């Protein structure tokens, strides 16, 4: 069971051939505050997984053996970037990020019946391409940055704005498949 509304996470599981269902957790991400980004994403992932796991019906959901919660943020120059609040914030962030590096952090929480909860954060370094103001404005005008942690989608138009990665590709999309393989 994927405890996420993210279409990108669903696509990752589908492409990897991992059968799953989706239930949105309903967790208000703004209610969970933490100064340290690694702990923040772990707490959010845990809250999402626990919210869905607690709502499982023992009789109707008996075939569900695991619940996976995830949450991602970009750690950039000491700040935590979730989804931009609007186009102005997205442009301001991209003006700072262009030509620099940031760490995309994804918290993962796997809850299985009668097994210990598994909680982890996977980090991937993202090298952003140097972009002109016109390139930044065109990308933000596409609307894509407003839907993604950090304000970019590696698997979409945002891939054109990235020079490279150090770490897990799928983690930047929202779920580390190598991590998931090791815990399943």
Curated annotation (Swiss-Prot):
EC category: hydrolase
UniProt xrefs under SUPFAM superfamilies: ITPase-like (SSF52972)
Reported cofactor(s): a divalent metal cation
Catalytic activity: a ribonucleoside 5'-triphosphate + H2O = a ribonucleoside 5'-phosphate + diphosphate + H(+); a 2'-deoxyribonucleoside 5'-triphosphate + H2O = a 2'-deoxyribonucleoside 5'-phosphate + diphosphate + H(+)
Taxonomy, superkingdom: Bacteria
Cystine bridges: none
Gene Ontology annotations of biological process type: nucleotide metabolic process
Active site: 71
GO molecular function: nucleoside triphosphate diphosphatase activity
Family: Belongs to the Maf family.
Record HAMAP family: Maf (MF_00528)
Name of this protein: Nucleoside triphosphate pyrophosphatase
